Amino acid sequence: MHLIRRGDPHLAVRSSEGLTTVELYGELDLVLVQRVRPELDVLAREAGALTVDLRHVTFCDASGLGLLVRCAQRVRSRGAAWRLLCDHPMTLRLIRLADLDDVLRPSPPSTAAPPAPRHDVPGHQRI
């Protein structure tokens, strides 16, 4: 599996044998959603199984949830596997309060491979 930088320090993509993992970084708010939506739309249409990793996301608002729902629905509509990795208590609470557990199906990190070390993400800047 290799890490592909997509020109945005808030997004990293890994692909291997039909599985694509998207790691998001920072605050998943309207500003970030507008920046990463085009890339996620392409991946939701074209990638095999898609995992979105929110373990480096520090905040998520309604626009972030909307992006995730859109992505999950597009992936599943083509019969591909969808997975959302999330361990942030407030994001998990937001998903529950919005009644999106069945749509997004968040998985705890303990059931997934660990995230890439920060030094593996060239050009990543903390915000």
Residue ranges and their predicted role:
Residues 1-60, 70-127:
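STAS-like cytosolic regulatory interaction modules
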